[in-house]
């Protein structure tokens, strides 16, 4: 039987991906890049959930990740539609420019 990768490696990978996503959310000014960073954080949480489910031998974690991925696909569709609508109205996706109220 091949040696299995320890759960701590998966959790470390998940932590690194989550940190990269968090840095992206905090430093980027373009709405699309912020959106992609949030998706990276969501996928990092999915990796952690699957790692815990694998270590406990439970399939419910994988089922939960499948549901989360389905909801994330809907989030992507809605989020990109909102970003496109904002771009059509304002000609920019820079969040600093979008924070200003129209007068």
UniProtKB/Swiss-Prot annotation:
Keywords: Cell membrane, Membrane, NAD, Quinone, Translocase, Transmembrane, Transmembrane helix, Transport. The chain crosses the membrane at residues 5-25, 32-52, 66-86. Disulfide bonds: none annotated. Its EC number is 7.1.1.-. One of its GO terms (biological process) is ATP synthesis coupled electron transport. It is a multi-pass membrane protein. InterPro entries: NADH_UbQ_OxRdtase_chain4L/K (IPR001133), NUOK/Mnh_C1-like (IPR039428). Pfam families: Oxidored_q2. It is an enzyme of class 7 (translocase). Its main location: membrane. NDH-1 is composed of 15 different subunits. Subunits NuoA, H, J, K, L, M, N constitute the membrane sector of the complex. Belongs to the complex I subunit 4L family. This is NADH-quinone oxidoreductase subunit K.
